[in-house]
Amino acid sequence: MITMDNIIRDGNPTLRARAKAIEFPLSEEDKKLAHDMMEFLENSQNPEIAKKYHLRAGVGLAAPQVDVSKRMTAVLVPGIEDDDEPIFKHVLINPTILSESVQLAALGEGEGCLSVDRDIPGYVPRHDRIKLRWYDLDGNKHVERLRDYPAIVVQHEIDHLNGILFYDHINKEQPLTVPEGTIILE
């Protein structure tokens, strides 16, 4: 089981490296990693389990965050209500953004990261809509359009695969000024 102790923190060089593509068929090690990453997200969103194991809630976890430099990320965007099915729940292998909207969006409360322990205020402009290609654990190709919050989460996770952290996108001189043309998602 992955816990916060397994998640590397800002400053570790793995977080700044471009992760390597994964070959199919997946190794047993890669399958276990995929399972464990999704399990962490599920556990982190369960208040009882999160409290018991001191987990910070997360909606995404990339392999580099557990010190594995491979192009794999787990994403679990929960439904609006507790009983709702997740909006987006997948382990993405070798994900690629095929196209993106001109329209930018940012989260009103800013972004956070399991690998960054400090609060870094500022708007993180991202594309409001993306067309995403990824492979599942069996090597099947998927193409899906995402918008708003799920699109932002996936872009954050793909950044991890490219050695980019969310605060790299924040305007250093005016972090709390909304970038021109950016819509704010609350």
From Swiss-Prot:
Q: Gene3D superfamilies of this UniProt entry?
A: Peptide deformylase (3.90.45.10)
Binding positions for Fe cation?
C113, H156, H160
Q: How is the cofactor bound?
A: Binds 1 Fe(2+) ion.
* InterPro entries for the chain: Peptide_deformylase (IPR023635), Peptide_deformylase_sf (IPR036821)
Which key words are in the record? Answer: Hydrolase, Iron, Metal-binding, Protein biosynthesis
Q: What is its EC number?
A: 3.5.1.88
Which cofactors is this protein said to need? Fe(2+)
Q: According to its UniProt record, which residues of this chain constitute the active site?
A: E157
**What SUPFAM superfamilies has UniProt attached to this entry?**
Peptide deformylase
| Superkingdom of origin organism | Bacteria
Q: Which reaction does this chain catalyze?
A: N-terminal N-formyl-L-methionyl-[peptide] + H2O = N-terminal L-methionyl-[peptide] + formate
GO function terms (MF aspect): metal ion binding; peptide deformylase activity
An annotated GO BP: translation
Bridged cysteine pairs (disulfide) = none
- What's its job? Removes the formyl group from the N-terminal Met of newly synthesized proteins. Requires at least a dipeptide for an efficient rate of reaction. N-terminal L-methionine is a prerequisite for activity but the enzyme has broad specificity at other positions.
The Swiss-Prot or TrEMBL record describes its family as follows: Belongs to the polypeptide deformylase family.
Q: What name goes with this protein?
A: Peptide deformylase
